[in-house]
Design a protein with these regions (language model features):
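Bacterial N-terminal signal peptides
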Residues: 9-12, 30-41
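C-terminal segment of classical bacterial N-terminal signal peptides
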Residues: 17-18, 38-45
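Short, low-complexity intrinsically disordered segments enriched in A/P/G/S/L with frequent Arg
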Residues: 20-27
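N-terminal, motif-rich segments that launch catalysis or mediate targeting to/interaction with membranes
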Residues: 45-211, 222-369
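Generic low-complexity, intrinsically disordered segments
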Residues: 6-7, 18
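Positively charged n-region of N-terminal signal peptides that target proteins for export
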Residues: 1-3
Length: 369
């Protein structure tokens, strides 16, 4: 892993001149493609958006929050913490030799939508529970193994190649965690929580907001909702790119070689956050999250078409079209994330168990006096 990172650092140093200037000519993209192929695995080992892209999504989401949103979220320290945590799930992926962690964390970053059909499933009729979904993947494989490509055990040490991704379940579950966090905070604030308890509850909320942003950001990256994640696979009538390094170029190579990501101007494209999901309908939030993935999926072919037309090459005078699509996806990710944060705050219910305990504690303390 360390050797790969060193080589990748060398790649960035060669591809981008000192000072972050414009690379000289098309060899930049060719060099990136050649070197990235040496270090990036085929499969879902690569990350969606580099750290700066994930930071941008979380920062854009913060721009969507209304004036009345809890003030502790808006302090400079909290905003930086939320932005930093955008990269946390990818840091977990850096522990390549920790197979239980890889098994748990890896599939939460993607969903290969086209592969649902292989299991007789459709995006509109997926179960809202992740283990119900994994069962629906396991049963056809067990009943008709001949219909599925064999899995190489040497490349499946973390036992994730039987899966096609769990990203929408991860997002929905994090929404529930955030609702719980707001419920706990309100209970501590209203029923005699100590300053330390209130501060810890606030820190829990900040943590969940930051980490969940990663998965929402992943699903704004078109290559994380398709089987064509590392180059086009199967029938290819349009002659789209098949090189596995395409993923890394979209994650961050393009932005690094075209001036980076400027969050300020993009923030102007963010509207105020709105409610997502009807809490009276248990499956509604999941359906809204799936709709978000399906919208992202609409950009898969346009993204490959831009590559085919060299509009994702820094030296092309029409590279602005490639930047527009990718920046648009960052904005969509930030918008969705802001909506989910806002919804969790608005829809948080009473934590009756905690309220009861706090009430009993307060009464006991009063009696002692």
């Amino acid at each position: 892993m360390k050797r790969s990172l060193i080589l990748f650092a060398a790649l960035a140093a060669v591809a981008l001149p000192p000072g972050g200037g414009r690379p000289a000519g098309r060899p930049c993209l060719v060099l990136f493609t050649a070197l990235a192929a040496l270090v990036l695995p085929v499969g879902h080992g690569a990350f969606a958006w580099d750290y700066e892209g994930h930071r941008a999504v979380n920062q854009l989401a913060l721009a969507a929050l209304p004036q009345g949103f809890p003030a502790f979220i808006k302090t400079p320290a909290a905003r930086e913490r939320i932005a930093f945590l955008a990269g946390e799930p990818d840091r977990w992926r850096n522990q390549g030799d920790d197979l239980p962690l890889a098994h748990f964390n890896g599939p939460d970053h993607y969903l290969d939508l086209e592969n649902l059909e292989d299991y007789g499933l459709t995006p509109e009729a997926l179960p809202i529970f992740r283990y119900d979904f994994t069962a629906k993947l396991a049963l056809p494989r067990a009943a008709h193994p001949e219909k599925f490509p064999p899995i190489d055990p040497a490349r499946n040490k973390d036992h994730t190649r039987e899966l096609i991704g769990l990203a929408p379940w991860a997002i929905t579950e994090y929404c529930g965690k955030l609702k719980s966090g707001f419920s706990c905070l309100k209970a501590f604030q209203d029923y005699g929580g100590t300053p330390e308890e209130i501060a810890n509850a606030q820190e829990n909320i900040i943590y969940v907001m930051g980490v969940m942003g990663h998965y929402v950001g992943d699903c704004a990256q078109p290559l994380h909702v398709t089987k064509h994640h590392h180059g086009w696979v199967g029938d290819n009538p349009h002659g789209f790119a098949t090189n596995s390094s395409f993923h890394a170029w979209i994650d961050g190579g393009f932005f690094r070689n075209t001036g980076g990501i400027k969050v300020g101007p993009l923030s102007g494209k963010i509207r105020p956050a709105k409610i997502v999901g009807d809490p009276t309908k248990p499956d509604d939030l999941f359906k809204q999250v799936m709709a978000y993935l399906l919208e992202t999926h609409k950009q898969v072919e346009p993204l490959y078409q831009l590559e085919k037309e060299h509009k994702l090459s820094p030296e092309n005078e029409k590279a602005g079209e490639g930047r527009a699509l990718l920046e648009g996806q960052l904005v969509k990710g930030g918008q969705m994330l802001g909506d989910l944060w806002f919804s969790a705050w608005q829809q948080a219910t009473e934590d009756k168990y905690l309220i009861r305990n706090l009430t009993e504690r307060k009464a006991a303390n009063t009696e002692k006096k």
